[in-house]
Structure formats: C-alpha cells, structure tokens
C-alpha cells in the first residue's frame, strides 16, 4: 500500500533533519504531558480530485507545537521548514512537487503556554 501523503511529507522532513528535537505524531495531537517536549503533527487537509494516472494536489497540515517557554525554538524550526521546502520543492519523488501555502501563519498559544504554528503544504503528485 502506498503511504498517505502526510506520511510521505513526514518521511521527507525526517530525512532532511527537520523533525530533530520534536516528538513526531500523525493525524491528531496527543498531549505528551511533558511541557518540555516539542511536538510536530502531520495530517491530511484535503486537496484536489484524485484521479488515476493524473496528477493531483494533496494538502498537508504540519502543526509545529513548541515546548513551553521555547517560542523562539519553535519559530526557528518553522522558518527552517519553510526555507527547506522553498529551496527543495522536488527533493522527494514520493512527495512530488511540494510548496508552502499561506507562508507562516500567526501563531497561537495553548492554555499551557505552548506556541503553535499551523503550516500548510500543497503536494502535486501523480503516477
């Protein structure tokens, strides 16, 4: 079975070293109950119609959730991710062409004081 696109993006980011220092999760945020842990969550977020033998656009959300009081570290990680994708839009043949959608959004804070950036990517892929 072919991995879902959010899993392929997770693998691409991991291979590029972009997830170092983060607990990596899929689909939904699962609180690690340790405010010193930063978390990165990969999940699908729709896209275009998926047709056989045609390219399709898959949208992937990547939530970058910083450790408590480590806002600068989370912001730096977000910038590294965006810079990497911009410089390497075709780094992984399993992802196809990836691009950031909407640049870097305004962060939000959780009740615990964690900063959260929600990045969205469009992956154009077809076989």
Positions of the model-derived regions?
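Generic alpha-helical scaffold signal
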Residues: 52-56, 72-75
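Mid-chain, well-packed structural core segment of small domains
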Residues: 65-90
